[in-house]
Design a protein with these regions (language model features):
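Glycine-rich N-terminal segment of FAD-binding domains in flavoprotein oxidoreductases
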Residues: 29-59
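Short, conserved loop/helix-junction motifs that constitute active-site signature segments
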Residues: 60-70, 99-101, 168-169, 194-199, ...
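N-terminal glycine-/serine-/threonine-rich phosphate-binding loop
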Residues: 1-40, 121
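ATP/nucleoside-binding phosphotransfer catalytic cores, i.e., glycine-rich phosphate-binding loops
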Residues: 194, 200-260
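Class I SAM-dependent methyltransferase SAM-binding "motif I" and its flanking Rossmann-like core
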Residues: 148-194
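Glycine-rich beta-strand-to-loop/alpha-helix junction loops that act as flexible
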Residues: 42-47, 151-155, 207
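A glycine- and small-aliphatic-rich helix-loop capping segment at beta-alpha/alpha-beta transitions
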Residues: 54-65, 89, 93, 164-173
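Ligand-binding beta-strand-loop-alpha-helix segment within the catalytic cores
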Residues: 2-4, 64-147
């Protein structure tokens, strides 16, 4: 099991998205109150997008000072910037285009046809450099200590674009290019476990019965090379936020909190 992971189960995907949104707002407000700014790493996927839409629709959305927030992505599809496959595009449509973010603090990963000359390795290196430039001495590493790092969960246990037994699962750099990805599109850029584990809090968010086996394996002692989600651990806190379907295969003895 991911060391110290907390498991919270909500009734269905809709309630899960709203609960994640409420947690995001509360955590960002608390971080800004304590240190003036905050940082958030976004994920793609259906439940990730639903959570961002729920943030936008929340009555408390303006409690966050969006101009004092650094926004990152855990992974990105290396396609044209206007492609519907881009996690960035989905996040902008769901939330970022509807709140007053500071464009200089929105750190999108590179895209095909952009300044990296269609080279995902160059895009990965440039993102790693950007991460390092934003790290402070008190972060004790080449990556900022993110307040929240959101991750989806693949049915085979992948997080970000780190797939089981893939080169990215063994990567020691903070950001890596991914080629021949088993899930389209095949070329991507991803934060590695080195970067993920630098976050203060890592939240794995999953809905649907097709995620149940992956959640069970990750929370029952699987290795992070075989089940990358097992290595998604925050420095201070690791949260697994699931709907009942995604939690349906968890072992009976696993501690969890269930909402009505």
């Amino acid at each position: 099991m991911s060391a110290g992971a907390e498991v919270i189960v909500h009734r269905d995907a809709g309630l899960l998205a709203k609960a994640v949104a409420a947690r995001i707002i509360t955590r960002l407000v608390d971080a800004q109150a304590s240190k003036g700014s905050a940082s958030l790493v976004l994920t793609g996927g259906g439940i990730g997008g639903a959570a961002l839409r729920a943030v936008r629709e929340s009555p408390a959305v303006e409690a966050v000072d969006w101009r004092r927030l650094d926004i990152w992505w855990g992974d990105e599809r290396f396609v044209a910037r206007d492609s519907d496959d881009r996690n960035e595009k989905a996040a902008r449509e769901a939330l970022l285009d509807h709140v007053d973010v500071d464009p200089a603090r929105v750190f999108a990963m590179g895209w095909a046809g952009g300044e990296d000359d269609n080279d995902p390795d160059a895009a990965a290196s440039r993102y790693a450099e950007t991460l390092a430039s934003r790290a402070r001495p008190e972060d004790h590493g080449p990556v900022p200590r993110f307040d929240i790092l959101l991750l989806g969960l693949g049915p085979e246990g992948h997080v970000a674009s780190i797939f089981p037994e893939s080169p990215a699962a063994y990567e020691e750099r903070t950001v890596a290019a991914v080629r021949n990805c088993p899930k389209p599109p095949p070329t991507r850029v991803t934060m590695t476990q080195v970067a993920i584990q630098s976050a203060n809090e890592v939240w794995v968010v999953a809905a649907g019965g097709e995620k149940a086996d992956a959640a069970r394996l990750a929370l029952s002692g699987a290795g992070p090379l075989q089940v990358p989600a097992a290595g998604a651990v925050g420095r201070a806190r690791t949260l697994w936020l699931l709907d009942r379907a995604a939690a349906s295969a968890l072992p009976p003895g696993l501690n969890r909190i269930s909402s009505p």
